[in-house]
Regions:
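Active-site pocket-lining segments that scaffold enzyme catalytic pockets across diverse folds
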Residues: 1
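Terminal accessory/targeting
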Residues: 7-160
């Protein structure tokens, strides 16, 4: 989020009792781990990786600002560089190497329906793929074996 907008987002979150907010501060190590496997589209990953680095720079003070405002966030965030090109292998590797704490994997799983077909998003085909990745037996097995707890932002707000 742009630095000038983040204080406004925090004020609105407090005003409307929203206890947690996304901070798009993507760690390079997590981005690298998630980029593994499959047939990678290197030009897309390069472009989106540059965007992720830019967002990381813009978000460098966001965590401290959110803490001062009493708004929770995840400890780690990843997935921007892989938007639309997420792979099962990358998700598996990420799950196997998660750091201690909470990590948001930003993705867009879903079904392609008539409403989605009417939009001008390049993420139409990848939604079904990401849904299949996240519900894949091998991915679910890693989650269970490693004791990974799947949560949402509501949990973050309650845990604070």
């Amino acid at each position: 989020m742009l630095p000038g907008l983040f204080p406004l987002a925090l004020r609105l979150a407090r005003k409307h009792a929203i206890g947690a907010i996304r901070i798009s501060h993507e760690e390079s190590r997590l981005r690298a781990v998630l980029s593994s496997g499959g047939e990678l589209n290197t030009s897309v990953l390069l472009k989106q990786g540059i965007q992720a680095r830019g967002l990381k720079l813009l978000a460098r003070d966001a965590r401290e600002m959110a803490e001062r405002a009493g708004i929770s966030s995840t400890d780690y965030f990843c997935g921007i560089a892989q938007t639309g090109v997420l792979t099962r292998e990358g998700v598996e590797r990420l799950l196997e190497t998660l750091p201690e704490g909470t990590t948001e994997l930003m993705c867009h799983p879903g079904y392609v329906d008539e409403d989605l077909r009417q939009t001008r998003t390049r993420l139409q085909g990848s939604r079904q793929t990401e849904l299949e990745i996240l519900t894949d037996t091998s991915v679910r097995k890693i989650v269970a074996t490693r004791g990974i707890r799947l949560i949402n932002y509501g949990f973050l707000a309650q845990a604070a």
